[in-house]
Every structure is written in C-alpha cells, then in structure tokens.
Amino acid sequence: MRNNLIYTMFLSCLHFETFCQNTTTSNDDCEALSQDLDNKNPVECCTTEAFDFLDKKYPNWRKVNKYVRSPYINELRFMGCCNKTISTSAILTTTPLTTSSTTLEIYTTDSDSTTAETTSVPTTTTSIQCGVLANTSCCNLKVTECLSKQYEDWRNVTLIKGYERELEKCDCVLTSSSTETGTVKFLDREFFRVFSSAEIASTTSLPTTTSPSLNCYWLSEPSNFSEWIDGKQTNLRYNGGCCSETSIQVLNSSDSTRWILTTSDSWNKANALINLLYCTPNACPQQSMLWTNCSNLSTTTSSSTMLSSTTLLTTETETRESSSTGSTQTTTPSTEPSTTITTPMEQSSTVSSVQKTRTSEDKPSSSTTVPTSASTSESSTSSPMAETSSSSTTSQSSPASTSTVPESSTVGSTPTTGLTTLSTNEQSTSTSSGGHSTSTFGTTSETPETSTDFTATSTSSSSDSSTQSSNAQTSTIENGSTTTNFTSAPSTSSTPATPTTTYNWPTGGTTWMLPSGEIVQAHKTFFSSFNYFQVLSESLIAYPNCTTVLMQLIYNPRTKETRTEITSDAEGCKKTSSTPTPSSTSVHSTTATPSTTPGTTTYNWPTGGTTRMLPSGEIILSESLIAYPNCTTVLMQLIYNPSTKETRTETTTDADGCKKTSSTSSSTPSLKHSTTPTPTPGTTTYNWPTGGTTRMLPSGEIILSESLIAYPNCTTVLMQLIYTPSTNKTRTETTTDTEGCKKTSTISSSSSKFSITPTPTPSSGTTTYNWPTGGTTRTLPSGEIILSESLIAFQNCTTVLMQLIYNPSTNKTRTETTTDAEGCKKTSSTSKISTTPTSPTSSKPTPTSTSMTTTYNWPTGGTTRTLPSGEIILSESLIAYKNCTTVLMQLIYNPSTNKTRTETTTDAQGCKATSSTSLKPTSPSSSTASPPTTTYNWPTGGTTRTLPSGEIILSESLIAYKNCTTVLMQLIYNPSTNKTRTETTTDAQGCKATITTPTPITTTYNWPTGGTTRTLPSGEIILSESLIAYKNCTTVLMQLIYNPSTNKTRTETTSDAQGCKATSTTQTPTTFNWPTGGTTRTLPSGEIILSESLIAYKNCTTVLMQLIYNPSKNTTRTETTSDAEGCKATSSGTTSTMSPGTTGGTTVSRTTNSNNPIDSSTLETTTFAWPTGGTTRMLPSGEIIISESLTAFPNCTTVLKQLVYNPTTNTTRTDTISDSEGCKATSTAKPTTVISSTATCSSLNLNLNSTTRPTSSEIKDSYSVGEKIYHICEKDYSFEIALQPLKIYQCLNGGAWSGTPEKCVATGKSEL
C-alpha cells in the first residue's frame, strides 16, 4: 500500500509544472541568455531547468530580439531558475524523491530570544510540489490535483492572500488564526514562505540589532551581492542593518514587492536595497542618511550629519555606456573603503530636464563648483547629454551661472568612511524622420543642498579643461576627483522601416494583457526598479510581416511627467494568446513580478455604433477583431455589467480564426481577395455606412466602413472602405466568397418570418449591415422600440432579420438577429402577374387587373430592406384576394441607376401560408364582377390589444368580399414564447354582422391625406381615392390613377350594387358640417385653412367654401369661391350607359376657372369635402398639386379639379378630370344655405420685380369676389417672408384681399 501511494504521488508530479532546480548546465545556449540588454552574467541562469522552463512556457523565446530578453531573465530569477548567492550560514539540501516525508527547516520567532529556532515539520512538499501551500494542511494530493485541474499555473502564486475562495473550491480552508507552521502573522497580514523541490532553508542567527519580535527574513542576514542591476555591475556588502518594521511595511505595501521578503534570489534582494529601502526614512536604522537618487518613490530629506563609522554598504561599480556612434566603458576600481555606486537612470518625462543641484543660493539651474580637500585629478570634462530633439526643452534660469561654495563648507574631510554615490543622470533623446518618431525621455532626482557627503562618480577624460555643452548642465568639483556625466539611456528597439501611421492615444477603455492572460485596466500602476508609473494609454500596431509595435503613454505621478515608450517585437503576431512582448527599457523590465510586463494586445476601442447584449444581461459596449497573417484572430470586447456598474475587457484568441470566415463545408477556403469588384450579377455602388464601428487591419490601415452584399447565386461580396494613414488616402477592397450565403445563418429555424427569436451573431464578424436611418420607429409589446431593421434574403431560402432595438427603461440599445431557414417560402411567387394595364371598362376584374379595389398604401417612413442584388426595398404591401391568391408589391430603388420600380409577386396559395387556424374558410364567390371592396392596412404605431390568453394583437386587418364574406387577419404576439404568428379567420356571413345602427344614406370619404401614394401591380400609382355609398345600396369606389409610362392620369370607378348592406339601408337627411380632424393646410399668405368643402349644383355651378384662420389677427373667416360653369368644363368624354359594376370612360382636360356669382335658386346638394391634412402633394412628374377637389353631379358625372404647380417652368395650371358615367343613382335635396356676393376688389399694388406672373398687362383695375391673382417669382427667387416662389391672392367679400403682397428676393437672402 505504501509503495502504491508513493508511485501514485510520483506519477502526479509528472503532470505538474515544477519550480526550477539549480543545476548548472553546459548547454551552449547559455550565450542566448547573456545577449540581453543588461549583458547579464551568462552563467547566472544557465541551468537545464531554466531552458526547460522557457521552452515550455515561451517556445519562441530564442527568436526574440536579443536586446529585449530582460523580462525572461527576471522571470527565471523569480521562479528560482538562476544560481543564487547563498549566505555562509545557509545550507542547501536536496531530499531524495523516494522518501515519503522529509523534515523541513523553517523560521519561527521566539518572543523571548533574539535568535530563531528550528522546527521540524513532517511534509510531503518535495513529492507533490505544494508550492505556496507547503507546510500547510492543504499540502496533499487531493488539493493539489484539484488546483491543477482548475488553475494550471497555480504554483506560480507566491501569496495565499486573495486566493481563499479558489482554495475553498478544492476543500482547502486556511484562516488568519491558523497555527500552521510556516505561517508568519504580522500586521494582520499572512505571508507564506515558498519552497522549491530542492530547497530547504536552514536557520540563521539574527544580528543583535534585529528586533526580537520581528521576522525580517533575509533582511537580518549580512550578505555579499554581485549583480548586474540597471545595466551596471554592482558589488554590495550588506551588514543586515535594514531589519526594521518600516522595511517590512514598505515591502508588504504592494503585491509587486511583498514576495521579496521570502525570495532567495540575490538579484532581487540587492535591487530592493539599492532602489527602495535605502531611500525610505527609518527603513534602515543603521543608515545615517537617506539616499536621494535611487527613485522618486520616497520623500527625500536633507541632513548634515556625517555617516557613522559603520559602513552599511560598499560597492564596486562598472558602468557601461552606449550610444548611436559607439560605446565607451569607464571602470572605477575598488579602493576600499572608499567606493561608489551608480543608481539606475529614471526615465519618465516627455519634456527633458537636466540634473538639478541646489546651491547655497538655491539656483536649481546653475552649475556649482565645490572645493574639496581631496584631489585625484586637476581637471575633468563633462560629456554632453545626448539630446537631439526639436521639441525638447531645458528648464534653465540662466545659461551657465556659477556659484562658488567657500572652502569652509561642510564637506566630509574623510570620505573614505562615507557612502559615495552618483547623482542620478538623465537623458532625453528624440529623433524624427519621415513622420516617424522614437522617443525616450527622462528626468533626474534632486540632490539636497546639504547632502555634502555624496560626491559624483568620476569619469576619466583626457581633456585639460572643464567644458559645458549648450544643451547639458554640468556639476563640476574643482580640484576634485569627480564630475557628473550625462549618459544615454538604452534606446528602445527599432520599429519597422516603414511605419504606417501615428495613432491618437485611445481614450477610455484601454487595457493591457499580462503574460498570465490577465487583463489590467488602464491607469493601473506598475513598478520599474521599484519606481511606480501609470500606463495612461497604449496602442498596438501589427504589421503584415508579423512585427508588432507597442506604443505606451506612461505617466510618473511623482514627477507629474509623461513620456512615450515604443517596443517592437519581430514575432509579435504569434504572441497574442500568452507570450509576452519583452521591452528593452527598464520601464517594462519589471523586476518585482514578471506579470507586470505589458502584453501585446491593446486596441483602440471603436466609439459610437451599436451595442449588443449578452445572455447574462451584460452589454458589449464595443469590440474589435484583429486578424494576423498567421491565421490567428483576436477578438477584444469591452463589456459593461449593469448590476455591478463595472466594465471589463474580454479577449478571445483563435489560432485558426481566419478559417472561420470561409466555408466550413469545403476542404479549402473559398475566400478570394481582389481589389476590384467581381463581375457578379446585380453589382452596384453603395453608400458607405456612416458612424458605427471602425476596425484596424494588421497593416495599420483602418476600415472606415464596410458592407456585405449577398447575390442570388449564394456569393457574398464584402466591400470595405479602407483608410491608409501613412498616405492619407482611401481605397476600396472587395472580398468575394462563393459560399457566403451559407455562413450567415447560425440557427435553422422553422418558425414563421415574424418570429422574434434572437440568434447569436457569428464571432468571425463577416457581416456588417447598414442600419436604415430616419423613418418611423415601431414599438414592441414589451415597450421596447425598434429603431431600425433590415432583412436579407439568400438564395438558399434563408432570411435573416436584423433589428436595432432600444429599451427605454435601461436606456440601452441591442441588436436582435432572427434567422429563418424557410424564409423565402413566405414570399416566393408561383406566377408573375401582368404589368400591362387592362381595359378600364372590364366588368370582371382579375387579380392582374389594374382596377383592383384592394390596394395597400406604401408604408411611409420606417425600415428599408436590401435585396441580394443590392437594390433597396423602400416600401412593400401585401394584397390578399378572394381566391386565396396573395400579391406582394414592392417599391424597389436601384442605387446604381438611381431609379425606382415596382415588383409584383403572386402566390396562388398565399392565404394558406398565413393562416395557422382552420376556421372553415369559405372561398368568396366568383359570380360577381368586382374584387373585394375593403381592405385595411396593418395599423401602425404602438397601439395593441390583449387577448384573454395573454397574447397581444399587434395589428389586424379586415377584408370584406362582395359575397358578404369577411376575412380577418391578425398579427399576434405571444410573450411567453416570444414569437409572432398570423391568424386568419373567415366568416361567410360577415357582412351581416355589421348592420346594427342606421347611418346617413350619403357617405363620402375624403381622399387620403398627406403626400403618400399607392402603387398598383401594373406599376400605375393611385394618387387618391374615395368611396361613395348611395341610397339604392350601391357603393362606388373612385380612384385617381397615374400611369408613369404614359404620363397620364385617369379615374377608375368601381361600383357594388349590394355594397350598402354592410353599412345602412335607412335614408337620412344630408347636412354637411365642416370636415373635422386631420392636419390643416397653410396658404402662401401664412393663413391656415382649418376646413373646406366643395358644393356642386344642378345648374353646373360649383361653390368652394373655406374656413380660414389668420394667425396675425387671431380671427377666423369664411371664404366662398364660385364657378358658374364648373360642371361643363369637366364633362367632355363619351357618354355611355353604365350599370353598377361597370366602369365609365374618362377624359382629362385642362381649363381655367371663371369665378362668377351664382343664383341661389339653382343650388342643389351633393358635397365633397376637400381633403384635410397635408400641405401639398407631388406627382411622379415632379409637379406639385397645391389643391384638388372631387365633385359628383346629378347627371352621374364626377369631376376632379387640381391646381398644379410646375417648378421647372414656374407656372400654375388647373387640371380637370371628368367621368361621364361616374354615378347615376345620386339623390338630390334642396340646399339649406344660399351664398352670394356682389362686391369687388380694387387692384393690388404688387411689386413685379423678379416675377414671371402676373405681368403688368395682366393686372386689372378691379376683381370680382373669388377671383385670384397668382404671384410667381422668377427662377432662384422666392418671397421674402413666405420663402416660396408662389403666392395666391383672392378677392374677398367686402373688397378685401386674402394674403399680404410680398416682393421676390434671391433664394437664401432677405432684405430688411
């Protein structure tokens, strides 16, 4: 049993990632680890485990530029893969794997003793690799296997703090009160020592200066360090003088430094001392003065106290300096105890500044000369600061002011016992060429005025004089041994030779990815040599050759300065999933934790455009897809969580992403690329979508807009408008996919085309729809509003409905996609109907006749739809006939030809496709002559009705047939299933159910108001129509029809001898009130016609009565206009006998009305009201109908009068259309009103400048009541106030004129 357990534990170890062992290898690859920026010792990390670790985690690490390998070495150190400097008291032992338990030596603290004692704890750490859980109750096979299944890299964690929840999932519970050996409780924080498989630390006696209540870890151990730190070889002798509560607090204050307490890596220890603790007040009690040049993290203080005789640290410094022209190396030999240390350069500003040395006169920009008693050189020369920039500035109050400090100044006379340092050097380089810039900027720390114990490291020079460069500032020590040397910081790796653009920094939403895959929000801080910075923004540019360039805008909160860092990676496109992009600068070479190295993927979030809602309720605010030449795609999504009000970034990497955009059913991708449109049918030029989301290509180019075109042969063409920032030009790219129609449907649905079932949008992002703009919105039963929608039909019968939906309650917008695999069957045609008009006198219309009575108005506003050919359906209407045939009429616009046409599609079994309930349908009889007389459009707007079942009737339409059959069509929404269906109910006796109350015998319907027309299947346009019911039960439908092909207008009349049975059979008197409701019309004078009515008398006289409101006077009056010969001017066609059900002949004539008073004795009744609402209507020819009226006369003649304005010729005419057989059953009655007028109006004083009508010869001395003057401006002129080219003045009762005369002025101008 024991052997089985050991064997099982051994096998489990093979599956886990192990920490590095410290076995030196003779591998020739050691040179690869030495060719980094800092030129680190190649032997330091040359271990077999180090190469195994890198090869496993970063397979391509050897291909990375040799100058940017520092992050890899830093991570190797952190993982314990490099040789360590072990103190003389430390013992390193290795426990054989065959033992089931070992004794682990750890530190524990005895409050009564100043030394640490050893505690032996049985553990299996070395067998099962417990990592940070070593020496805890969770160090067992069950917990480690559970963690390995869920978190592959869990052994890389150095602290348990913050991972309690993850541990609980694997039945591991550790509390702050735990008494587990190995847990150190301090300041309410828990820290756990990390032991590798080959490391067991022994006890070490603490110095007598160490507080007995503190566990200072290695801080209490005197040590010798010899490390390359920040580009310099530094030898350190540390006496253990930084063991204090302050040091512990400083290191524990950040996750970036907390782990250093338990590290065994000498490089991290030395770096923490030099760049953090020595600069922190009270961190090192034995240190007499603070360092002021290692970082800006701590507040500097000044003191004139000499260093104590106890030497905390002595160093031997070797400085390597490189520049673009060559390299120089200066070595200061060790002359113990007088030694120096050079601290790292800090790079953190976009505006260069030079070293500031305070003098007694506090002139920060001056050069200071300090005499000393020691002398090793008579003169020295400061090398100029490498600075080449047209934008860099040097803050300097005087060019070269000098201040001399007296020799009696407090300068250490025995510097051999002091700590000698180099004040931080600074450099700023900026080169600009060809629009591309590479910048590295920095600032320096400040040396306190009284810090006289610090002198500058000497740099040998052959010059006998001391000089100062014009763009550098030098601190010189006369007769001394040292000068300040300004050196260049390591420059960033070069970018590709042909960079494409300079990007605006992304605002908001910027993130960066750590090598662990974690995403860090913008404004997160990171540490470089323990200095703390913020990444304000960053952008990644990917080039076709696989190179990526990371641009970062970095802010230093301490100095309040900003700089730009540029990092390139020749293999960057391959590292978007997990591999980090190392940087050549110390900012990215984070020594604290490798995870602070910025990742390779940071995108500019697209602004504007459509948001999408995830099933979880989260909202995708923005997203971007980047495709790399190696087929990898990276989808970045900015996601907002409404419940937590937080935003996060999701990154999805797909190594085979490019294959998702081509056919999945074929063995080879069918995607073809070309720069010109393919010669497929129905190609056209589209208006590029405006607004919305932009995307960036790997080349750095930007896709400003794109559109997907689907053709009947299943081919899709993706057109992209691409902008190249480097050339500032735009081009069009066309991508063709012969199997494209098969890739847009992700769910095969068999529900009706009205189904509102959302389907996921393909992640490949191959389809972008232009949302229709403008028009009418629609409201769903849930209260949400459909802002826009688009339907795409594919050759394989699939239809995809895309809807842009706004939710008023959440103030959010989402996109719904509904796919119907059988969508084309809902609209497919079984026969094409004729578009040639048939004879208007046909007594038995067929579904192809132009005299159909069931015609739908084209929907106005609202949503357009795009056909696979690229044409746009502006509007459409479905007509249902009694024989079950349905006719779909579509008004289609062709952008390429800029023309509009009407398409008609019939379905012989159309009524069956919409009926889901069998209610004993009765086919309407075909024995009668006319088609159905009444069909209602689906009601628009947001009004709905709720059924007892809870379902909602969104809209409904009733069709009444002449055989008394009615068909009710209802569009019903089911909230529980979130689907919509159509119900059809047929009633063979439906017409009888409506006879309930008597109504007036004479019923006249107003012409449809507004400017909307309706198109017949033949392509002809119904400009207006009216239904009249007579006392003999006959109903007459009159339609004013325009034929675009012949450019003529005619009147169609359809009568139904039994039409009145559905409404009324009781005779009532005829009294016409002013028409109410609807929209008013405004006259050119600015007056408003509230209502109007036209009366026709048997003596042929017509009288127009208008109720007019004057806004300026706030009064209302009645205007009456008569025409004594009105009826005669309209009847000119051939008279024929007409019975109900037949259509009479029509003629069109144009006459000029004569306005004469009438004899009241001749008045008869039959009054048609002018249409209420609307202003003017435009004919297909471009002419404008200013006003019109339909009149029915006792002789059965009907007359349509239209006042038509032609903008092209700037003239007005009257068109009269008559039908001699319009009606012969009209009843008459005596009128109740007599209207007469005998007054006249004097001539108007008109300004005829820039007018075409009237001419001076046309102006009369007087006008009769009702006469009009048409005042028309010349081309490009309009009236000064009315802002239109036409005004009509009419003679009123009492001799006054309607309207105020105005003068014509040039369009767009007005005169005061």
Curated annotation (Swiss-Prot):
Entry annotated with the keyword Signal: yes
Biased segments, Low complexity type: 299-344, 365-503, 576-609, 660-692, 826-864, 914-942, 1063-1076, 1130-1154
Location of the Sushi domain: 1239-1306
Location of the region described as Disordered in the Swiss-Prot/TrEMBL record: 299-503, 565-609, 645-692, 749-775, 812-864, 899-942, 1048-1079, 1114-1165
Coiled coil residues, start to end: none
Residue stretches of biased makeup (Polar residues): 345-357, 899-908, 1048-1057, 1114-1123, 1155-1164
Signal sequence region: 1-20
InterPro entries the record matches: F26C11.3-like (IPR042312), Sushi/SCR/CCP_sf (IPR035976), Sushi_SCR_CCP_dom (IPR000436)
Top-level taxonomic group: Eukaryota
GO CC, any one term: extracellular region
Keywords: Disulfide bond, Secreted, Signal, Sushi
Disulfide bonds: 1241-1291, 1273-1304
Biased composition (Basic and acidic residues): 565-574, 645-659, 813-825
Annotated compartments: Secreted
Main localization, broad class: secreted
Protein's recorded name: Uncharacterized protein F26C11.3
